[in-house]
Amino acid sequence: MKNISILGATGSIGSQTLDVIRKSNGELKLIGVTANTSVKKVIEIIEEFKPSYVGMMDAVSTHEIKKYCEEHNKKIKVLEGIEGLDKIASLDEIDMVVTSVVGMIGLEPTMKAIEAKKDIALANKETLVVAGEIVMKAAKENNVKIFPVDSEHSAIFQCLRGNDINTLRKIILTASGGPFRGRTLESLEDIKVEDALKHPKWNMGRKISIDSATLMNKGLEVIEAHWLFNCDYDNIQVVVHPQSIVHSMVEYNDGSIVAQLGAQDMRLPIQYALLYENREKRIADTIDFYEISQLTFEKPDIDTFKALNLAFKAGKAGRLMPTILNGANEAAVELFLDRKIKFLQIADIIERCMEVFKTQANKELTLENIIELDKEVKEYVIKNAVL
């Protein structure tokens, strides 16, 4: 049995992780969960999975969960805020942490988990985007395994199994193209929030859905792949694959290409990360190749979707430039979801921040500098946002 903590248990990835645990026939046990403020969902988790630890992000929801546990005689340790995240990520009782919180808040608990020598099922992109060098070094020093939960990185991870990574020539990251694939820049001027949230293939949270619409999600995945697989940016290629059946590919020095195919179901990469090397259980539908009419591949339109190109530039610049990229994107996406800026302004804001903060990008790469600059960039975006 493997004991698990989930950071962000009520979100899209967290909920699907719970389903993997539910269907694991006792191979996985939930020990700790954290959530933002979703009291009702956490109570449902408590009743079904009986975790020993629960963390909520604010005082009100923490009080409500404590009150519920007292009234129903639940012997659960209820924790609050970032301290609760850190504690639940590094419990003595657990073997692995699923980091499915969204945004920069995932960085600190991920580092705490690594320091406590807990393996990581990583669904929080921002951790590697802003601090990949620090995180991967710490993981190596603490003999911690990092299992990617993103479908693309899980695919690459699987394609590399049994092969010498030194013979890797190129990583080919596939992208669905998002809901606006094939659209012109002019046609995206007045995109509504509701339209941007309608991903054609995947069921995802709000922030990642907007990132997919701008192609920033793929840009963040490029930086993530660079750190996970120690691959130069010039050897990472993004290919638009609208059917989302080929989840990613790797090309070796001999010219052969290995691809991973599967259903559009995030439970597949989650299960692979949690039950590594155990492929006995089928949790998702299989592909019927007689039903697939075609698999197509296209070049991404980086003129219309410039966020992808900005991510490549930030990754190549290194140091703190990915922090600027990520912070500006997080703040801009939030403003768009709140209907305070237009869709195309997201990438414009990111580009402007990369220019405004470029001198600070060369500071030493430390967790303190990352957190400080992230805050500064977000404050700048909020202060200067104009619809």
From Swiss-Prot:
Top EC class, one word: oxidoreductase
Binding-site list for 1-deoxy-D-xylulose 5-phosphate: K125, S151, E152, S176, H199, S212, N217, K218, E221
Domain of life from the UniProt record: Bacteria
Gene Ontology BP, a term: isopentenyl diphosphate biosynthetic process, methylerythritol 4-phosphate pathway involved in terpenoid biosynthetic process
Chain residues that bind NADPH: T10, G11, S12, I13, N124, E126, G205
Transmembrane domains' residue ranges: none
Keywords for this protein: Isoprene biosynthesis, Manganese, Metal-binding, NADP, Oxidoreductase
Cofactor needs: Mg(2+); Mn(2+)
Annotated pathway: Isoprenoid biosynthesis; isopentenyl diphosphate biosynthesis via DXP pathway; isopentenyl diphosphate from 1-deoxy-D-xylulose 5-phosphate: step 1/6
Gene3D superfamilies the record matches: 1.10.1740.10, NAD(P)-binding Rossmann-like Domain (3.40.50.720)
GO molecular function terms listed in the Swiss-Prot or TrEMBL record: 1-deoxy-D-xylulose-5-phosphate reductoisomerase activity; manganese ion binding; NADPH binding
Reaction(s) the record says it catalyses: 2-C-methyl-D-erythritol 4-phosphate + NADP(+) = 1-deoxy-D-xylulose 5-phosphate + NADPH + H(+)
Residues binding Mn(2+), per UniProt: D150, E152, E221
Enzyme nomenclature, EC number: 1.1.1.267
Pfam families (UniProt xref): DXP_redisom_C (PF08436), DXP_reductoisom (PF02670), DXPR_C (PF13288)
Entries under InterPro entries matching the protein: DXP_reductoisomerase, DXP_reductoisomerase_C, DXP_reductoisomerase_N, DXPR_C, DXPR_C_sf, NAD(P)-bd_dom_sf
Described function: Catalyzes the NADPH-dependent rearrangement and reduction of 1-deoxy-D-xylulose-5-phosphate (DXP) to 2-C-methyl-D-erythritol 4-phosphate (MEP).
Family affiliation: Belongs to the DXR family.
Name the UniProt record assigns to this protein: 1-deoxy-D-xylulose 5-phosphate reductoisomerase
Organism in which the protein naturally occurs: Clostridium beijerinckii (strain ATCC 51743 / NCIMB 8052)
